[in-house]
Design a protein with these regions (language model features):
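Extreme N-terminal leader/targeting segments of oxidoreductases
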Residues: 1-27
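N-terminal Rossmann-like FAD-binding beta1-loop-alpha1 element of flavoenzymes
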Residues: 23-52
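Redox-cofactor binding/interface segments in oxidoreductases and associated redox assembly factors
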Residues: 30, 72, 225-226
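Glycine-rich FAD pyrophosphate-binding loop
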Residues: 45-65
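Dinucleotide-binding Rossmann-like beta1-alpha1 core, especially the glycine-rich loop
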Residues: 73-152
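Helix-loop-beta segment of a Rossmann-like dinucleotide-binding subdomain
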Residues: 87, 114-124, 153-181
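Helical element adjacent to the flavin cofactor pocket in flavoenzyme catalytic cores
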Residues: 141-143, 164-221
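Flavin-dependent oxidoreductases
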Residues: 200-263
Length: 263
């Protein structure tokens, strides 16, 4: 079985060189996914010297494996936010999601990026009657915030469902093709280096020094870390993901079953 994202299967891309010298810049962006390239896109006319690096090819990380959905409807999230915080916070989150959708679709249309952008509807469904009350609470939030919706008894697909909530103004697109479009648009305006892994980031007096796995250095006034996971340990932060270098359990038993030694 071929294990490859449907977004990148059969898609050709322009390869960028890897970093092979020490350089300086005003802004360094680490990570060439949708966060990194979107950041660079919005800075492209700033007049700053901008460098973007990615440990592999741009867009081959988390972005290439996402759902390809642009929707403010993410399960029954607004009911959850409202329950844990308040309606104002839930509304702020809703507006942020709508703004993100508008930003991406506007860029696609303005730059004429071919990424299969299609307007569609979004759905949340359940067959668990115990969860129906949560649908009612989500609908109440929709009503208060003028969100168009429809309650259905089945999905458009041939999939069993009893409670279906449908909303409008969502999109689907190929995120990898979108990033390819951004990269081609930006490659002549900024410096993009692929297969360039950042392994160390040090704060100096008035600049940052990023060291790569090939022992090259990037001196920058500002650094944007747009990688899926941070590649460095931040003081007072707990690492969410670390590499397991070695793990084993050994045991020796004596005649006394209570005497067990673990290593």
């Amino acid at each position: 079985m071929k294990k490859i994202s449907i977004w990148i299967d059969g898609i050709k891309d322009v390869r960028m060189d890897s970093l092979e010298e020490n350089i300086e810049c005003d802004i360094l962006v680490i990570g060439g996914g949708i966060a990194g390239l979107s950041t660079v896109y919005n800075l492209k006319d700033s007049g700053k010297r901008i460098v973007l690096i990615d440990k592999n090819k741009c867009g081959m990380g988390a972005t290439s494996c996402n759902t390809g959905k642009l929707t403010f409807m993410q399960d029954l999230i607004y009911h959850d936010i409202e329950s844990n915080y308040n309606e104002k916070v839930a509304r702020l989150y809703l507006n942020s999601q709508k703004e993100a959708i508008n930003i991406i679709t506007s860029i696609i249309k303005k730059e004429k990026i071919d990424c299969d952008l299609t307007k569609t509807n979004a759905y949340v469904f359940s067959n668990d009657e115990d969860k129906y009350k949560n649908f009612d609470k989500e609908i109440e939030f929709y009503k208060k915030n003028n969100i168009r919706y429809k309650v259905l008894s089945s999905l458009p697909l041939n999939y069993p469902s009893k409670m279906v909530l449908e909303t409008y103004d969502s999109y689907v697109f190929n995120p990898y093709k979108y990033l390819i479009g951004l990269k081609r648009l930006l490659k002549d305006k900024i410096s993009i280096y692929e297969n360039t892994r950042a392994i160390r980031l040090d704060k100096k007096n008035d600049y940052y020094l990023c060291t790569t796995s090939d022992n090259y250095e990037i001196k920058s006034k500002v650094v944007v870390v747009a990688s899926h996971y941070p590649f460095f340990i931040v003081p007072y932060f707990t690492p969410f993901k670390t590499r397991v270098e070695k793990f084993f359990i050994g045991a020796s038993f004596s005649n006394d079953s209570k005497n067990i030694q673990m290593t």
